[in-house]
Each structure stands twice: as C-alpha cells, then as structure tokens.
A protein has these predicted regions:
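N-terminal transmembrane-helix/juxtamembrane module of multi-pass inner/ER membrane proteins
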Residues: 1-97, 139-152
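Alpha-helical transmembrane segments of integral membrane proteins
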Residues: 33-41, 116-124, 187-194, 219
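Short hydrophobic alpha-helical membrane-embedded segments
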Residues: 93-100, 192-197
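Hydrophobic, membrane-inserted alpha-helices
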Residues: 83-84, 100-107, 175, 199-203
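Membrane-interface loops
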Residues: 66, 102, 106-185, 190
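Aromatic-anchored segments of alpha-helical transmembrane domains
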Residues: 51, 126-133, 197-206
C-alpha cells in the first residue's frame, strides 16, 4: 500500500530542493553580486529613509501639517475613488491581499528554476518591511481624522504609508519582470500603463479612506521606488554575470 503524504509539507520540500539545486548551479559570482548590491542598497536606502523621516518631522510644524490637511480635504472632494471603493482598492496592499501574491510568486519562480527571481522576491518583501519600520520607529505620526471621523485610520504610524510601500515594491517587481520578459514594445507600454493605474489606485485608496496624509503617500511611493530600484539592480547584475558565464542558460536575461 502506497504511503500517504501530506501535500503542503511535501510541496514545500520539493520546491526547496529545486531552489537549492538550481542555486548551486549558478556562478558564485552571481550570488556575490546579488548580495553585495542588496547590502549596499539597503544601507543607502536606510540612510535616505531616515533622513526623509527626520526632515518631515522637522517640517510638520513648519507648514507640512497645514499642507496635508488642505490637500486631504481637496482629495476627499475630488478623489476618483469613493470611500467604499477605497476599501476595495486598499486590499492589494494589506497582508491578506499581499501574502498570497508573495508566496505564489516565490513558489512559482523557485519551482520553475529561477532562483535569483525567487530570492529577489523574498528580499523585496523583507526589505520593504525593514525600511517602513525604520521610519515608523523614528516617527510615530498621528493619523488623520478628517474623513469619516478617522474610522479607517489606525492610531499610529502614519508616515509613510505601508500599503503604498508594499504595493510599489512587490507589484513593482512583478511589473518589472513582465516588462523585461516581453519583446513587444506595445506590451511593454501596456505594462507601464497598467502598473501606473494599479499602484496609483491603491495609493489613492488610502487618501479616499482618510487613512493617511498626502505626504505619507508621497513618501511611501518614493521609499518603495528606492527599494524597488535596489532589488531590480541586484537582479540585473546577478543575471548579467550568469549570462556572461553561461550564454545559453535559462536565466531570464533582460531584453
């Protein structure tokens, strides 16, 4: 009689074995370039994020708070998303919406023998948390209560918007992978349009709900872009090493 297997542990084990096997097949220099780029990028990003947070703290009483209040009320009246639509569109940026995307992308890229992409996915997710928590630990800014009496705004950590950072980094990585894989300029154009709309609508949802000040969202977009540039640069440099070493390998080379 065939011995039964627990599907989830067996699947995770199989994915891990594939990842390990393919990882060992890559040039050591590729992983070295990947790690070094991430380490330097994380250090620089952390310094920039800390600096931006300290600047925003200093500017709060010098006009930033008044500017935020003015523009949040303007966005309340002119935001293309209603409050109820904001509830829907903020979902891709929360844990419930993002974790399945993260685990699926990591599992698929590991299973289909793209260890650099799988590792970059993990680094992207963990790194964005590190940067957000660095800023939150530096400044626990109060959330707005100007829309619906602040019903959709938790009490702490307004700057930056964590939803916006995670959407910019994780979905930004997905759109980047799609863009670099396509040979069609028309498709690449569609990727840019779709990425702009997707990230933009999630960002606007946080303002529609009154969950963040406008400067929180702007800072989230910038910090997320900073980390996205870091991880995609690390992936590009490592992929370039693989391509030089094994020109005919399956490593996904940017066009």
């Amino acid at each position: 009689m065939r011995k039964s297997k627990n599907v989830v542990p067996y699947g995770i084990s199989a994915i891990a074995r594939r990842f390990a096997r393919k990882s060992r097949a890559l040039p050591a220099e590729a992983w070295s370039q990947w790690w070094k780029t991430l380490a330097v990028g994380l250090g620089l990003s952390s310094l920039i994020v800390y600096g931006i947070t300290r600047l925003a703290m200093g500017w709060e009483a010098q006009g930033l708070q008044a500017w935020d209040e003015k523009w949040l009320l303007i966005m309340r009246d002119y935001n293309p998303l209603s409050f109820s639509q904001g509830i829907t569109w903020q979902s891709p940026g929360n844990l419930v919406g993002m974790l399945p995307v993260f685990f699926t992308l990591t599992a698929l890229t590991a299973w289909f023998k793209e260890p650099l992409v799988a590792a970059t996915t993990v680094a992207t997710y963990i790194g964005q948390f590190a940067l957000v928590w660095l800023s939150w630990g530096t400044w626990s800014r109060d959330r707005p209560d100007l829309i619906a009496n602040g019903i959709a705004a938790p009490s702490l950590h307004s700057f930056p918007s964590g939803h916006v950072v995670v959407v910019m980094t994780m979905y930004g990585l997905i759109f980047y992978l799609w863009f670099r894989t396509s040979d069609s300029w028309l498709e690449r154009g569609l990727v840019i349009v779709f990425a702009t709309l997707w990230i933009g609508l999630v960002s606007l949802s946080r303002l529609a709900l009154g969950a963040h000040w406008p400067s929180d969202v702007i800072a989230g977009l910038f910090m997320g872009l900073l980390w996205l540039i870091t991880v995609t640069t690390a992936l590009q440099r490592a992929t370039h090493v693989c391509h030089k070493t094994h020109p005919k390998s399956r490593v996904n080379q940017p066009q």
